[in-house]
Amino acid sequence: MAIIDRTSAPLSPSYGTNALNRTSFPKGFIFGAASSAYQEDVSIMKGMGLDAYRFSISWSRVLPRGKLSGGVNEEGIKYYNNLIDELQANGLDSYVTLFHWDVPQALDEEYGGFLNPKIVNDFRDYADLCFQRFGDRVKRWITLNEPWTFAVTGYDDGSCAPSRCSDWRQNNCTGGDSGLEPYIVTHNQILAHAAAVDVYKKKYQATQNGLIGITLVTKWMVAASNSSVDRRAAQRAQDFFLGWYMDPLTTGDYCRTMRSLVGNRLPKFTAQQAKLIKGSMDFLGLNYYTAQFAVDKSSSNGVNQSYTTDSHATLLINCNESVSGELNGVPIGEKVWHICILATSEVYLTTKLTFCGLISKLHTLPSIEHQAGSNWLYVYPKGVRLLLHYIRKKYNNPIIYITENGIDEVSNSTLPLHDVLTDNFRVMYYRRHLSYIQRTIKEGVDVRGFFAWSIFDNFEWNSGYTSRFGVNYVDFKDGLKRYPKLSAQWFKVFLQK
């Protein structure tokens, strides 16, 4: 469990904004935030100076039975219309995700959800309805959010709904096959994505003048050693992670690495499907938080097949070969920050105590942990630059939006409010990632926008309310009152026009 020392003096809300701010990015670059928000929260976003808000539409909120034949819930349509109108009235663009893992229960019960190709047409119809009802005001559509996460946590390790996995995993799953179902689910997600894009381009894009894409979760894979086997393992890990989706979207088929290692368990696209899938995005959304070490495990005996083991690469948080960001006790990101204060009261944060000696004869405050509240999130800002260049070179430099980036902390109700709001670590996280993103733009990567995760503390899947990613604090015990953290104040200064 990460411990964040909040005894350190808070940074200034203007920390580092003279050197890096909105004007450091190209004209028209979009700054936004994402999470779940109420209509009345729009004024908070406007006050911060944001350009856009990214949110998802709940499939079953507008189609309770999952299908058009089951009827449209006009109250659900009204809810989203009101939110979109409120955003528009306050000068905020809507970036809308169509699927964020919430399969309508009726479709799961009828035919198994994304395990069945029938879902492709139902998703297409749902998307068509959304384009028809909201597309006059929504100019950026995202078909799927993190299809990898949905496929792997739902059908390989079973940690999320619908909690399916092989018996040998002993995760108390509801049935499943970890070596087969993740590939079927991803295959149908890709086909559903392409079907929705096809409808939008044929029926709506010319008149609504919007763009449509997909958001993928990403990590930078770092070889655990300089050995050739570990370097190849890092590439295999990336092929199975990012390439699982990007290769079909850019070439019409899965990469050779996956074809070789997964064999006939990996579904095949027909010639017509491949044609529909190839190039089926106007932009690419990337969710980037962290990086991981990759270690070769090509000696696996293959008895217990699963997506996780098929790549023959182990992704290392501690030296015990669990899902990890540490190798032999060495974290992948700089883990400890030191705060140095100059005579001018200017504050510097550094991972090297020697740096404090170079810039100041004053004191160094106690170090603070740099690992996030989530044990999977080690901070590795330069990974975003390496990843963006990798995509530029391998996948023809697509238009990119960073659709999620952020860091959490463990919720601690015993802390005074002032301490809770002093999130120096989050300010540093955002500033360093934005600095690398700005650098990659200058180097030729076509990044068009950045969305912080998240605008408010919210319900974080398996972590519930115990994990806080928000730049605005939500008091869950006192009427959901909102309080701006230091990071929200920093963004307000950063975004000034």
Language-model segment annotations:
Residues 2-39, 65-67, 74-497:
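Active-site region of glycoside hydrolase catalytic domains
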